[in-house]
């Protein structure tokens, strides 16, 4: 399990620009809006640095506030694909989705930043950056246990300061 100290130590590496910890569940059959079920979606439990580290920007509504990570606020950000598929042309902001029987209020819509071009050098990198689901839902990582009733392993993404630093950033982070 990653701790705040782990993240601090990773971010202090000279090769690292930022890092994020997250959990993920692919194809949950527990995501609804009204009577519409979303098949083949992916749910992410993210920390406050996820969007910046991975290259997302909020295009509608707002992103997570600090309190969303500490107060167990049941809020969600969805990607544009899910917004279009599940809400059928309506704005999702302010709507309530059901994840595993728990109501989450959608506060924003995210898209990949067009300036963000990851370097993909492994199969894991490909799956991290190339999403083929019918949509993504992001919830604060502290809400993961509310939705799935148990902890799952966290993943870590490290954003290097430049391409020359990628190998060392990854190796040094893995050693921590």
Give residue ranges: language-model regions.
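Short acidic/polar micro-motifs at solvent-exposed secondary-structure junctions
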Residues: 1-3, 7-12, 21-49, 64-75, ...
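Generic non-transmembrane alpha-helical segments
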Residues: 9-16, 172-176
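Glycine-centered tight turns that cap/initiate beta-strands
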Residues: 12-18, 91, 152
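A structural micro-motif
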Residues: 16-17, 41, 104
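A generic structural-conservation signal
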Residues: 19-20, 60
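Mid-to-C-terminal secondary-structure elements
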Residues: 49-63, 74-176
